Amino acid sequence: QKVDDYQGVVKIDHRFSNSNTISGRLLRNKNDYQEATGNLPGFFALINYQNWNIAATDTHIISPSMINSFVFTYNKIDRRQISVVPGDKTWNDFGAGFTRTFEGSAPAVMHTQVDGYFNAFSRFPLIHFRQNFQFSNTLSWNKGAHFLELGVDVRRQILDMQELFRGDPYIRFGNTWTGEAAADLMLGLPLQFEQIAEAHNFPRTWALGFFAQDDWKVNRQLT
């Protein structure tokens, strides 16, 4: 297995005035992961993650007793997963008659298990593109014996997803027909095979939150 990870961070702070400051941070991350999922060499998954994260905070002193804080965050996570099979060969290249359960082209996928011998597994192609937005505002007010806070939080979540899980078949050979799993493999007599249709999903969600809080200091011993 192999992992390459690259990260970069930029941070900035700026004061517009004695009562207004802003700070921001940008994070860029790229991760390439070669995952060996079975126990035969040459079969693995190439997984690529790319992440952008942006955060900004604006703090405004409205008066000696009142402060407003606004926070914005944005997070973008892209995941691309590709299967790697020696020679880019599927079972159909060896004379089988399986039909892929998706349209278009994709790298060859292999998930073949021979009980007691090996598990040739390369994972399956997929893409996950996620975006998350968050807007938060908090107003803090110190008024005599009361410390008041009012806030709102708005979140937006976006996901674009495509998965070709078992578009090429999962095939398992046991000792069902000949009493020997390897012999069943040579004769092309599987114990089990499974295929699943292509999955598309594009959910979009909103989340809204509000809060109000009063810390009341009744006396020195009671709040």
Regions found by a protein language model. Name each.
Residues 1-223:
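Short acidic-glycine motifs
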